[in-house]
């Protein structure tokens, strides 16, 4: 019996392992999260594995009925730290191919896990990362189209969802990926939908109304597949317009993301059949105890529940 109610939680930035803490703390964190209602499953990054302690460790310490949405963002950014050309939308052909090879690893990993646990991984979030040193949007779009043609041709056992990140054309890019209009144009011929992340859209224009605009654009194109809520701030520990997954307001006093914003995006999505809905939040204090890490996530669940009342 698969669990299709509740939220997909990007809990990993709150996990003790995100701050290289002990395995005992990590076990306590997942045990408390497992006892939390309204969770459908997890958004989990995949570097070599789905968890720093391995795939099996994650499966063993989380409920069997939780589903997983895999995100490519963490490894994409790690690799771009060493080579800014790495990405599916990169005009650097060698690095574009290196990124496609990483997606081949994801494909093999996901299919192996789903072969052993049918329906465990429901979606992969992919990203249109261009060559960081080349501002040419047309070249990035062309590169993304070539990557997509190859990656989409594989026999995936999960859905593919493009997570929009702040665009390379924005005033102060953090990720600086392909603009949404170019993403939608490239996805037109594919059964690949779009995930809008609240902060990643707000950061793009340094504008808290842009997530709603992006949600509307994706919906009108018939491509809205998921909504994920991460916050951003103007000051304080989470910085100025940073992509650091600030919790909801008022739990995080500086957060720009409110229950009203959630309500707006859900109203805009309306009858669109979302593949998943959830949030990703970061514990900014590396020395925080497990209870505070869990409190951030439980507040996120409460915020989404409240927005739907």
Curated annotation (Swiss-Prot):
Pfam families: DUF4862. Induction: Up-regulated by L-ascorbate and repressed by glucose. It comes from the Bacteria. Disruption phenotype: Does not affect aerobic growth on L-ascorbate. Belongs to the YiaX1 family. Member of the yiaKLX1X2PQRS operon; however YiaX1 is not required for L-ascorbate utilization under aerobic conditions. This is Uncharacterized protein YiaX1. It comes from Klebsiella pneumoniae. The gene is yiaX1.
